[in-house]
Curated annotation (Swiss-Prot):
It is a multi-pass membrane protein. The gene is TIC214. Residues 256-268 have a biased composition (Acidic residues). Belongs to the TIC214 family. One of its GO terms (cellular component) is chloroplast inner membrane. Keywords: Chloroplast, Membrane, Plastid, Plastid inner membrane, Protein transport, Transmembrane, Transmembrane helix, Transport. Involved in protein precursor import into chloroplasts. May be part of an intermediate translocation complex acting as a protein-conducting channel at the inner envelope. Part of the Tic complex. Residues 248-300, 788-807, 1580-1607 are annotated as: Disordered. It comes from Solanum lycopersicum. Residues 1582-1601 have a biased composition (Basic and acidic residues). It is found in: Plastid, Chloroplast inner membrane. InterPro entries: TIC214. The chain crosses the membrane at residues 18-38, 64-84, 87-107, 124-144, 172-192, 221-241. This is Protein TIC 214.
Amino acid sequence: MIFQSFLLGNLVSLCMKIINSVVVVGLYYGFLTTFSIGPSYLFLLRALVMEEGTEKKVSATTGFITGQLMMFISIYYAPLHLALGRPHTITVLALPYLLFHFFWNNHKHFFDYGSTTRNSMRNLSIQCVFLNNLIFQLFNHFILPSSMLARLVNIYLFRCNNKILFVTSGFVGWLIGHILFMKWLGLVLVWIRQNHSIRSNKYIRSNKYLVLELRNSMARIFSILLFITCVYYLGRIPSPILTKKLKEASKTEERVESEEERDVEIETASEMKGTKQEQEGSTEEDPYPSPSLFSEEGWDPDKIDETEEIRVNGKDKIKDKFHSHLTETGYNNINTSNSPIYDYQDSYLNNNNTGNLENCKLQLLDKKNENQEQDLFWFQKPLVSLLFDYNRWNRPFRYIKNNRFEQAVRTEMSQYFFDTCKSDGKQKISFTYPPSLSTFWKMIKRKIPLLSLQKTLPNELDTQWVSTNKEKSNNLNKEFLNRLEILDKESLSLDILETRTRFCNDDTKKEYVPKMYDPLLNGLYRGTIKKGVSSSIINNTLLENWEKRVRLNRIHTIFLPNIDYQEFEQKAYTIDKKPLSTEIDEFLTLINELGNEAKSSLNLKGLSLFSDQEQRRANSEKRTKFVKFVFNALDPNETKSGKKSIGIKEISKKVPRWSHKLITELDQQMGEFKDRASMDHQLRSRKAKRVVIFTDNKATKDAEEEVALISYSQQSDFRRGIITGSMRAQRRKTFISKLFQANVHSPLFVDRITPLRLFSFDISELIKPILKNWTDKEGEFKILESREEQTKREEKKEKDKKEDNKRKEQARIAIEEAWDTIPLAQIIRGYMLITQSILRKYILLPALIIAKNIGRMLFLQLPEWSEDLQEWNREMQIKCTYNGVQLSETEFPKNWLRDGIQIKILFPFCLKPWHISKLYPSRRELMKKQKQKDDFCFLTVWGMEAELPFGSPRKRPSFFEPIFKELEKKIGKFKKKYFLTLKILKGKTKLFRKVSKETTKLFIKSIGFLKKIKKELSKVNLIVLFRFKEISESNETKKEKDYLISNQIINESFRQIESGNWPNSSLIETKMKDLTNRTSTIKNKIERITKEKKKVTPEIDINPNKTNNIKKFESPKKIFQILKSRNTRVIWKFHYFLKLFIQRLYINLFLSIINIPRITTQLFLKSTNKLIEKFISNNEINQEKINNQKKIHFMFISTIKKSLYNISKKNSHILCDLSYLSQAYVFYKLSQTQVINFSKFRSVLQYNTTSCFLKTKIKDYFKTLGIFHSELKHKKLQSYRINQWKNWLRWHYQYDLSQIRWSRLMPKKWRTRVNQSCMAQNKNRNLNKWNSYEKDQLLHYKKENDSELYSLSNEKDNFKKCYGYGLLAYKSINYENKSDSFFSRLPFEVQVKKNLEISYNSNTSKHNFVDMPGNLHINNYLRKGNILDRERNLDRKYFDWKIIHFSLRQKGDIEAWVKIDTNSNPNTKIGINNYQIIDKIEKKGVFYLTTHQNPEKTQKNSKKFFFDWMGMNEKIFNRPILNLEFWFFPEFVLLYNVYKIKPWIIPSKFLLFNLNTNKNVSQNKNQNFFLPSNKKIKIKNRSQEAKEPPSQRERGSDIENKGNLSPVFSKHQTDLEKDYVESDTKKGKNKKQYKSNTEAELDLFLKRYLLFQLRWNGALNQRMFENIKVYCLLLRLINPTKITISSIQRREMSLDIMLIQANLPLTDLMKKGVLIIEPIRLSVKDNGQFIMYQTIGISLIHKSKHQTNQRYREQRYVDKKNFDEFILQPQTQRINTEKTHFGLLVPENILWSRRRRELRIRSFFNSWNWNVVDRNSVFCNETNVKNWSQFLGERKPLYKDKNELIKFKFFFWPNYRLEDLACMNRYWFDTNNGSRFSILRIHMYPRLKIN
C-alpha cells in the first residue's frame, strides 16, 4: 500500500511538473492561436478551394506561415512589434494593397501572360497569392480577435525565465495546430468533392452551371468579403489627409508645433508651454530637462504627479550655467511675452534659462540664416511625421482635463527611461534615468571624438567605489561608537544626540527659517518664502552679478558652428551700468506688467515687488527707450528670475504638454470660455442639454444672467470624451439588444439581465393553492402561515408596484430620448403639440359643450352654459420647456423648435353631463376629492392627457358613464318595486288556491267521516278516542319546542354579530336587515309547515294493533282496506318528509356558517396565547442563562443601537475576523496601545511558585498582556514569518480593540455573521480594568495649567521617540518571550530598594476614546497642510456625518452617550455636569457651546469633560488656532485637520462643537462664514504675533484673554486675497472672473483641500425639482397669488423647502445630512519624518512632559548601569530626581534620520555575504549573531542571555517592519512618495563592525 501511494504521489507531481513546464504552456498557447480566425484564413481557404496547381497552394501556405512567424517574432522582438502596431503601418500596407487587389480581380487580362516556360516562382499570380497570405497575416485579426491570447502570452513571457524556449514551443504548437487545421480542411474539401449526395442534389442538378458560376465569381466574392473586413478595422484609423486638425492655443504655439521634434521614435520632447513658459533653475535628478517641459511657480499638491520640484539656495544657482534644452536637431524658441516691439522669428535656440544670458544670441541671429533654415526644415521632416502628425489627437488618446493648467499633460512620455549608469561601482541599468541627459550624452558623443572621452575600466570603478564607501562607513561607525562611548560615561549633556544645522534668516536676531521651509532640516522644499525684498538689495545684487550672467556659454559652439559671435559679443557688452542702476525700478515694473499678461494661471503665489505708486512713476518715453535697449540683450524671463534670486529658488521637473487647450461640447453650451465662443468644441461630451430655469431681466450693465441646469441624456454614452477626429477603439464582446439601453452588456452576463415578463413565472406561486387545501384542517398552523404569507404578499405587492413604476419611468425616458435622437423630430412634435392645443382649446371643447347642452335641451333638461364655460375658461395651457419647467401661457421657451416643448394643462376641462349643486357636498364626494390626484396634465402629440411628459395617456372620465349609472339605479329601483308587488300577489293567489282546495277536501272527507262515525259509534268505546288525541297533541308540542329552540339559536347568533362596535355602521345595518329578512322568511316557512302538519293529523286512523280491534282483522276484506289506506298515507306523506329534510339541512348549514368566524377567532386567540406563553418561557430561560454569566457592558450610542449593533443578548461576544482588516491599520492601532500598569501584580508573577496556583485561563490572559514569567513559556525562538504576524494579531485582539472598535472596523454584513472562533472570554473585569479598551471614555484627564505646546522640531524629543520605537518593537517581535522584556524584569522589591517612589493614580493609564497614546495635545501632529496620502479603506466604517440631535432626546439618552467609568474618582459629579452642558447647549443654540469661565471650579467639579474626544480640548478655553493653509470655516479648521489625518478618530459633531469661543463672543458673533470683499480684517497685535516664535503664537491662552476677538485667521489669508486679485488679472479672459473675494476663496479652498458633497435622497430631490418648476412659473406670472395658493394646496410646492434662510448655518445643513465634508485624497509631499510617524504611530508623549526648563534636563538622563532596565514612567508618577532609569532601545536614534539611513546603507553595502532567500537568517541561526553589547564593551555569550538578542532585534526592528508593511501595501514601487521607502528596499541591515 505504502509503495503504491508513493508511486501515485510521484506520478501526480510528475504530471504537475510537465503541465507547468514552459514547453507545454508554449504548445498550449500555440494551439490556441489556431482558433484566432482572421482575414488571412479567407485567402488560404480561397487558395485551397479555387486555385489550380500545387504551386499556388504551396505559396499560399508558405505566405500564411511566414506571416504568422513574423507575428510570433514580434511578440519577442519589440521593434517589429512596434512597427506592426503603429496605425500608419497598417494604413500604408492596407490601402494601396486593397486598391491593387481590386484592380487585379476586375482586370485579370492585364496581367494574363498566357502559359510561360519560365520558373513558376517568378509567376506574378503565384507571388500575389504569397503576398496575400503574408500581408493579411500582419493585419489585425478579425472574427475572433486574439487580444486575450496576446495578453496571456505577454503575462507568461513576463513570468517565465526561459523566454526563447517559450516562444519556440509556442511556434511549434502553432505549427502543429495549423498543419492539423489545414489537413482537416483538405479532407473536408475532398469529402465534398467525392460525396455523391451533394452532387445529386435536385437544385444543383437543375442548375447545371451553378457550380461553374460560383467558381468564376469566387474571386469577386472574396474581394467583397475582404473589402468589408478591411473597412471594418480601417474604420478605426483616421486617414492622414482628411483628419480634422485642431486649432492651437496661440500662434506662438503653432510655430513650436511646426518645429516639433523630427523623429517619432524619440518621444521625449514635446511642446513648450507656449506663452506661459517660465523656468527657474535646474533639477538635481534631471540636470538637462527635456525640451517639452513646463515649470510652475508655487506649490499645488495636485501637481505632484507632473512635477517634482526641489528648492535650493539661490546663491548656488550661478554654478549651473549650462542649462540648455536640447533636441536632436535643434532648439525651439518660445516667446515669453506678447510684446509687439520685438517679434521673434522661428529660430533654433530653445531658451528657457533663468540663471544666464544665453538668450542674447537668440535676438541677434541673422534673418537670412533663419529663412534658409526654414526652407531646409521641410525636407528634414520625415515622411511619417508629415503624414501622421503625432502631435494631434489622431490616436485614441483621452484628453484629461485639468482646471489648473492651461494645457493638458502629454501621456506618451514614460515615467521610466532605461539607460546605463554607475551604481554600486558597477555599470547597471537604471529605469529612472533622466531622458534628456541620455540624449544630451548621445549628442556629445557624436560631436566630440570618442577617443577624447576617458574610458575607465569597470574593475577600477568597482574597487574605487568600494574603497570610498568603506572609508565613509568606517567614519560613520567611528562617530557612532564615539557617541555611544560618551553615553557610557553617563554624560548629562544632550550633545550626544546629533544636532541638526538650521538655516538662518538673520544672524543678529538669531531668526531661523521655519522648519517647514528649512532645506537643511526638511529636505529641499517646494514652497516659496513669502518675504518682500527691498529694491536696493535687488539693485546691488543685480549689478554684482551682471557681468557673470551676460557671458556666453561657449558649449553652444559644439552644436552651432555657423554663428557669428563677434557682433553678438560687442552688442552684449555695450551695456551702460549707470543708467541701469537708476532705471532698474522702471525696468522691473515693466517686466512685471509684461509678465502679468503672459503669466500662467499656475502662478498663484507670484508677488508684485513694488507698490502701485512706484509702478505708476515710470513714464512712457523712458519705457520705450529702455525696452528697445533691453530687448537687444535681455530676456524678460531672465530678469524676472534675477529679481527672485534672493529667495529660495524653485526647481522643477518639467512635463511634456499638448499645445492644444480643448473645450468640450458642454463647455461650449455653457459658454464657459467666452473668448473662444467662436471656436468649435473638440471633445465630444455626453449628450446634454442646457435647461434655462430663470433669466434675470433687470437692467444691468452685464448681459442677462441666466440660471441654468445641465440635463444629461439617459441613453448610453458612447462618446466617452473622445476627441473629434481621433482614432476610435473598437469595443468587443459587447452587444446592444434594445433601442435604448443604459449600458452595453457582455454576453457573459445575459443571465443577470432581468428576464422578459412573458416567460417569467414563479413555481412557488403555482404550488401555493394546492398546499393551501392540504393545510386547511390544521387550524393553528394555518393561521400562523397566513400571517407570514400576508406580510410576504404585501411586500411582494409593494415590490411589484415599485418595479412597475420603474418600468413605466424607463419607458417614458425611452420615448423622450427617441424624440430627442430622431432628426427633425422635435420640430414635428412641437408643431403637432401647438396644433393639438389650439384644436383642444378652441374647437374640440367648445363643440362638446354645445353638443351637450343641445342634448340636455332635447331631453327637456335645463342647459348648463355658464357652468361649462366657466370651467372651460379655468383651463390654462402653459408652455413648458422640454424638461417640464413652466413658463407662461403666452411665452414660448427659447429655441423651442430645436430643444423641444411641453404643454402643461392646469385644471383640465372635463365634460360632465350635469353639475351638482355645491352647497352641501356629501361626505363621499369629499373623500373622492381627497383621493383625486393633482389637477394638471401634459398634452400628448395625439391630443391625449398624460400625468407626466411622455407618460402613458391617462383615462379620461367618461361623459356617458354617470348617465348609465343613473339609469341603472333607476331601473334597479323600478325592478325592486315591480318584483315586490309580483311576489305579494303571487303569494296571495297561492294561499287562496290552497285554502280553497283544502277546504273542499276537508268538506268531502268530513262528510264521509261523519257517516262512518255514525256507523261505528255504536261499536267502539269512547275512551280510545280520547287517548289518541293525547298522543297526537304530545307529538305536536315536541316538534314545536324543537323549532323554537333552533330559532332562538339563530337569533342569538345574530345578536352576537350585532353587538360589535362597527365603524362603517351604515353598511353593516343594511347587511343586518337582509339577514333578519331572511330569518323571518325562514320562520314563516316553518310555521306554515307546522300548520300543514296539524291539518294532516286528524286523518290518522286508530291504531290497528290494539287488542280491542282484533275482531276487525278477522275478515280479509277489512285487512285489504287497511293496507290500501296505509299505502295512500305513505304516498302523500313522502312529499312532506322530503320538504322537512331539506328544511333541516338548510337550517344546520346556516348555523354552521354563522359559527365559523366565532370558532376561528377562538382558535386564533388560543394559538396566540400559546405563542406568548412559549416566548415568555424562552425569555425567562435566556434571562437565567445571562444572569449566570458575567454581564458584558457595551457602550451603545442610543440612536445607532438598533441599526448598527444587531447583536443578540445570547451572542454578545466580540465578532472579529482578522482577515477583514487592513494590516496597516491594525498595525497602526496596535502600535499605539499604552504601557500597562504592572506594578500591582508584578511581584506575584516573578517567582516560580506562582505558576502552580494560577489557573490556565488567567495564565492565558496574562500571556496576552505579556506580563508572564519566563518559566511558564516556551523557550524556543519563534519563526518570524507570516505566523508571527497572525499570532501577534491573535494575541492582541481581545484588549486592543473593543466591541465598538470591531463593529466600526468591520462592515455590517460581516459583523452580523457570528464568528465563533474569536469569542471573547468573559474575564474578570476587576483584573484588567486599567488596560481594557472596553472602558473607552469620552472624558477628560486631569489638566495641567501649563499650556505650552509641544513641537516636532525640538531635538530633545528623540528620547520619547525611542520609547515609541521600543514599545512597538517589544510588542511585535517579542509577543511570546516577554519574560526578558523591560516590563517584567525587575521584581517589585528590587524597585523599592532603588528608592523609586511611585504613586499610581487610579486614573493613570486609562485609554482615551481616541487611539492616540497618552493624552497628548492635538498640535503634536498638526502642521500646515497635513493631509496624508491615503485612500479609503473599504473595510473601514467611516462616519456617516449625520449629527445627533440633542434637543430631541433631551436628557434621556445621555447615559448611553457617556460611558462613565466605574473606577473614577467618587467625588466627580459627572452626571450632573453632563446635563448642565446639555442644557447650556439648548439655550445657546448649535454653534456656541459654553466654555467654562473658571478653570479651577470646573476641575474641582469634574476632571472629565463631556465633549472631549482624544483630549482634543487641552483646555477647551485654551484651544489654539493654528496658522493653517486654509481658513474656510476658521472655527473648526484645527479639528478638521485632525480629521483628515485620522478620519476614524473624531465624530463629525465635535468638528463643529468644540469651538474656541467665549460667552460674550457667542452672543455678539455674526454667523457669516465668508467675509465680504469690502470688509478688511483687522486683527489686533498682528505685528506682535509675527515677531513671536510659533510656539508662543499658537498658545490658546492669548485667545482666551482677548474676550471679544474674532476668530484668528492666519496671515496667509491676506496673502491669499492679494494673490487671488492678482491671479485674476493675470488669467486674462480664459478663466471666469470672480466677482468677489469670497468666491475666489471658496473656489480655491474647494479645489485644493476639501471635497464638499451635497447629498439628498431621491424624495427630497424630487420635491426640490417640483419646487423649482413652480418657482419658475411664479416668477413669470403677473398675478401669481392664485397659482401659488393652489399649488400649495395641491402640495406641489412645499413651504419648508421654499423658506430659504438668508444665512443657513453650516450645522443645520450637516444636521440634515445634506452637507458632507470629506478631505480630498491628496498626495502631499510631506517630510519623511512625519509620514514615518504616521505609519508606525510613534508613541508621542503628552506635552506636560516636554517642558523646556531646567527640571526637564535634570530628570532625563541616561544611566549606563541600568541601561537594560528601561522602566516606563506612567503619566502621573512622582520621580525621585536622584536616580532615573531611562534607556534608548534603538541606539542608532542618536544619529538623526538622514545619517542613520546612511549608516545602515553603507554598512549594508560592505557586507557581501547576506542571504537573499531567508531574510531572517540572523534570528534562525543564533550562534552567528553577536549581541549588541559590544557597543557598550560588555561581552556575554549569546546563549546565556537572550535579552541581548532581543535588543539586537530592536536595533533594526522598526525599519525592517516598516519595509514589510510597505511591501504589503505596495507603497514602495511607482508612487510619488516612493522616496520615503527607498531605504526599505534594502533587505536587512547587518550589525556594525568594529575595526
